[in-house]
Every structure is written in C-alpha cells, then in structure tokens.
Swiss-Prot record:
UniProt key word Membrane: yes
The family this protein is said to belong to: Belongs to the major facilitator superfamily.
Keywords assigned: Glycoprotein, Membrane, Transmembrane, Transmembrane helix, Transport
Protein name: Major facilitator superfamily domain-containing protein 4A
Domain of life: Eukaryota
C-alpha cells in the first residue's frame, strides 16, 4: 500500500480528532494577527498613548509564553486535553466579543492576557496530541496544523480592514516627538493602506478623545464577526468530547455483548499493543508532561547527556527562527520607510501582508513535501535559506525589488521550520522526552525576546542594523542546528524503548527515516 496509503489510512481512522486539532489552530491564527491592523482604533477606543497601548502586546505575548509552558498540565489524559482546548477556543470567542467594551487600556491588556493564556494552551496541547496520535507520520499533519495558523492570521486582518477608521482621532496638536524611534514597533504593525498618513504621536494620554465618525462602533463589528466565525471551533471540540464519551452528561453505556474484534482487543495484553494504532485515550501519556514535570521525572536521571542536549539545541533553533518571524513581521515596515530605501507608506504597508501570505503558502506547499522529504532535510533547507536571504538583502540593501522578493523568500523558508523541527526532534527522542513542551516554550520565548532586542538595536543603531540582526540570528540558528545533528548522531536511544516499538520504527522508516 506504501507510505501514502498508510498515512491516508491513519487519517481516516483519526479524521474527527485531527480536524478538531486543526480547527483550534485556526482560532490561534485569528487571535495572533488582529491586533496589528486594529491598534490605532483600539488606541482611540481606550484613549491611550502608544507606550500605554504597548502593554497590550506585552501582556498577550507574556501570557502566551506562560500558557505554552503550563499547557502540559492539561495533557495527561485525553479528557483534560479536550476540555482545555474547548475552554481555550471558547475564551478566544469571548475575548473578541468583549474587546469593543474595553474603554481602559488596563482592562484591554487584561483581556488580551486571557487570550494569550488560551493561545499558549492551544499551541502546546494541539501540537502534542497530533504528535502522540501519529508519531513517526506526524510531519504531514503538523504541516497542515501550522497552515491553519497562517490561514487564520491572513483572515483576521481581511475581516477587520473594511471596519478600520480612516480618520485620525487624535488632535492636531498632539504630534510632538514625531521623530521618536521608540514607537516604530507599534506603528509598523498598524500603518497600512488605511493609515498611511499616520505618524508616531507623543507619549501622553488624551482623556478627552472620542473616535470620529463612529470609528469605535465600526471596528466593533469586526471583532464580533471574528467571534462568530470562531464559535464553531469550541463546538467541534465539544462534539469530539461527546464522541469520546467524556461529557459528564453522557454516561458511558457498555454493550451487553462484545464483538469478536472488541473482545480480542479487550483480552490482548497491553504491553504488546502498538501505541500508534490505538485511539488517543489509550495511548501512553508519559514523556509529554508540562515543562516543570519534565524536569522532575525520575526516569530522566539516567538519560545520556545527548538526551538533554537535543532538547536544548532544538529549542534554541526555534528560539531564533520563531523570533526572526516575529521581529521581521514587526519591523519590515519601519525598515522600508527609513533611509536608504524610503519606500512610500502605502507600498511599505504591503510588506507584512506579503510576508504572512508566503508563510501561509509555504505551509500549504510543505504538506505534500513533508510526506516525501525527511524533517531533518527540510529544517536544513529552511535555516540555510533564511541565512542566504538575509545576506542577499544585506548586499542589495538599496534595492526595493530585492526587499519584496526577500520578504516573500523569508516567508517561505520560515513557514515550515517549526512543524519540521518538532517532528524531527520527537523522532530523535523516540517520543519519550519533553520535546513538544520545550520546543513550544523556546519558540515563545524567542518571539518575545527577539522582538524587544531587535527593537532596541533598531532604535539605537538605525535601520541598517535590522538586516544585520537577521544575518546574526540566522547564523546562530544554523549553528544550533548543526549542534543538534551532532548530538542526534551521538544519541544512543532510550533503553526503555520496547523491542516492538523499535520494530515499529524500522517499519515506518521506509518513508520517514531520520
């Protein structure tokens, strides 16, 4: 039947849970990209200055990181995982519905902190559940999972765009400190075709401001539409809970007689079962605990140093690549409008959309590619492509055409790095480590830290440092990946892996070798 036939067979057997995990990542994508284009309207709504509204970004990113690190608490049983996904996806709809009523920036930051916790929980739990369900065949399904992030991230700005205010709600005399570069991070995320004439404003609060032309009311419609669009996602999780008989209102009713197949399954010794072929609720839950439990597990005491080195180097690779994704999408506009390029505001506003568009396209293309190419090879191509692209951008830093081509190229190379890296690292550790939690946490820390670091360097050294930072961080990612390959080659494998598990790995290696 071949590799493709086995993968399609696995998908048919696990169709409903797979579609459910994909859909919750669509919620993740919706929530991660809406703040940028709506930030100016939200600033008018909350009567806040740019430094004040910046806490909204910080609270979301910080709580996303906390949610990713603590999400492992809900992964010990299938019931806990599904209830966590249901609560998180429902919370995202509630956040969208409540945002129009947040008239104070502190309240808005608190609401976005809740959204960040929900997003972090979704990030960890959905990734881990797919890896647990498909194991060596998980690369294709992880690529689809992260495609839905890009799809949601593309859709939310498109929904918000018709409702954005074209009028400036700030008074004309509030243009002091317009040369301040400290706010480029925030302005770069929101200056698009509807805000091409906007400039950074002063660090003061405007208590008497009211949005003109009903701007606050109009943008409220965008949030309510996104809340409705996201509402089927928690319903899908609820249906999966019902199917698995995990709803408290649906008591389990056992049949009086078992069929021959069910009887054979009941009487089969558990130690001879193939974990990858069992439903998720029967699979082993060891090795995928939260970050703190992973560090305290007694069976890790005898693990070789390469076991820990694989965790660390894998997390460092994603620290760099995911951090570059966040930093580039945040600062590419600011870099374009500065000298020497001096691109017009309207033209530069297309760069973040181009970047996310090619990330989505890359994740779509990587779905068939990942079924025919090893994850290690895909990560190598991605990391080398990132370094080469930044070098080309640095050499041709005066050419606007190369900036657009390089932005599209970076989107393609960065698109599939995370799912490929996750599949490769889990495969290297034979699904017995804490790779999912550690890698998700490392990626979250990188996205938060590198944005702050690049922003500080950009402000202090000028626009040229933006590309220099990209080259440096790309080279660091490549170095950490070479170290990961080295530690993987030295890794002897875990002694606790049963013999049959090893034979399963040899069988799967026909189409998914390490």
């Amino acid at each position: 039947m071949g590799c493709d036939g086995r993968v399609s067979g696995l998908l048919r057997r696990n169709l409903q849970p797979t579609l459910t995990y994909w859909s919750v990542f669509f919620s993740f994508g919706l929530c991660i990209a809406f703040l940028g284009p709506t930030l100016l309207d939200l600033r008018c709504q909350t009567h806040s200055s740019l430094p004040q509204i910046s806490w909204v970004f910080f609270s979301q990113q910080l709580c996303l990181l906390l949610g990713s690190a603590l999400g492992g608490v809900f992964k010990r049983t299938l019931a806990q995982s599904l209830w966590a996904l249901f609560t998180s996806s429902l919370a995202i709809s509630l956040v969208f519905a409540v945002i129009p009523f947040c008239r104070d920036v502190k309240v808005l930051a608190s609401v976005m902190a809740l959204a960040g916790l929900a997003m972090g929980c979704i990030d960890t739990v959905a990734n881990m559940q797919l890896v647990r369900m498909y194991q060596k065949d998980s690369a294709v399904f992880l690529q689809v999972l992260h495609f839905f992030v890009g799809f949601g991230a593309l859709l939310s700005p498109l929904i918000a765009d018709p409702f954005l205010s074209e009028a400036n709600c700030l008074p004309a005399n509030s243009t002091a400190n317009t040369t301040s570069r400290g706010h480029l991070f925030h302005v770069s995320r929101v200056l698009g075709q509807h805000h091409v004439d906007a400039k950074p404003w002063s660090n003061q609060t405007f208590p008497g401001l009211t949005p003109k032309d009903g701007a606050g009311t109009r943008v409220s419609y965008a949030f309510w539409i996104m809340a409705l669009i996201n509402l089927p996602v928690p319903m899908a999780v609820l249906m999966l809970l019902s199917k698995e008989r995990l709803l408290t209102c649906c008591p389990q009713r056992r049949p009086l007689l078992l069929s021959a197949d069910e009887l054979a399954l009941e009487t089969q010794p558990p130690e001879k079962e193939d974990a990858s072929s069992l439903p998720p609720k029967f699979q082993s839950h060891l090795g995928h605990e939260d970050l703190f439990s992973c560090c305290q597990r007694k069976n890790l005491r005898g693990a070789p140093y390469s076991f820990f080195a694989i965790h660390i180097t894998g997390a460092l690779v994603l620290f760099m690549t995911d951090g570059l994704t966040g930093a580039y999408s945040a600062f590419v506009y600011s870099y374009a409008v500065e000298k020497p390029l001096s691109v017009g505001h309207k033209v530069a506003g297309y760069l973040p959309s181009l970047f996310w568009g090619f990330i989505t396209l890359g994740r779509l293309l990587s779905i068939p590619i990942s079924s025919r190419m090893k994850p290690a090879t895909m990560v190598f191509i991605n990391v080398v492509g990132v370094v080469v692209t930044f070098l080309v951008l640095l050499i041709f830093s005066y050419n606007v055409v190369f900036l657009f081509v390089g932005t599209a190229s970076l989107g393609l190379f960065l698109s599939s790095t995370f799912p490929s890296m996750l599949a490769y690292t889990e495969d290297s550790l034979q699904y017995k480590g804490c790779a999912t939690t550690v890698l998700v946490t490392g990626a979250g820390v990188g996205e938060m830290v590198l944005q702050m670091l690049v922003g500080s360097i950009f402000q202090a050294q000028g626009s040229y440092s933006f590309l220099v930072c990209g080259v440096i961080f790309g080279c660091l990612a490549f170095t950490f990946y070479i170290l990961l390959l080295f530690f993987h080659r030295m890794h002897p494998g875990l002694p606790s892996v049963p013999t049959q598990d090893r034979s399963i790995g040899m069988e799967n290696s026909e189409c998914y070798q390490r």
